[in-house]
Amino acid sequence: MTLVEVVISLAITGLTVAGIVTGYIFCLTTTVKDGLYMAANASALARLEETRSAIWAPDRAEPLDQLTAANFPDKVVTLDKSGDGSVITSATVRTDIAQLSLSPPVRRIRVDCIWKFKGVELVTNSIETCRAPDQ
């Protein structure tokens, strides 16, 4: 074996190891981001269920309307916490309720869960639905 062959084989080995390490880091980052996506989606769904359980009964003898944006202020939730508790990923859950139609009465409910990935990339998970009274 000559020195040139040894240098070329070391270069190929170095590139292979670098590719494996880069692939591992990419997979790890993607897995962490996916876990945060799922946690944010669960937080948005939880707030959507809160709005679904609010009473909206305009046809009662005494009309009752708890389905207003004022009853669902912005809420800060924890999506993830490191093992020692030093790194916390938090999100803000924002609820928007708008009247779509008066006859028949229908409201649009939109829930946004806004969070930052690694403190840099701003990500928003959104869920939107429509609701009629007494549902």
Annotate each PLM feature.
Residues 35-135:
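Low-complexity, Gly/Pro-rich coil/beta segments used as flexible assembly/activation regions
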Residues 1-45:
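Aliphatic-rich helix starts adjacent to a transmembrane/signal segment
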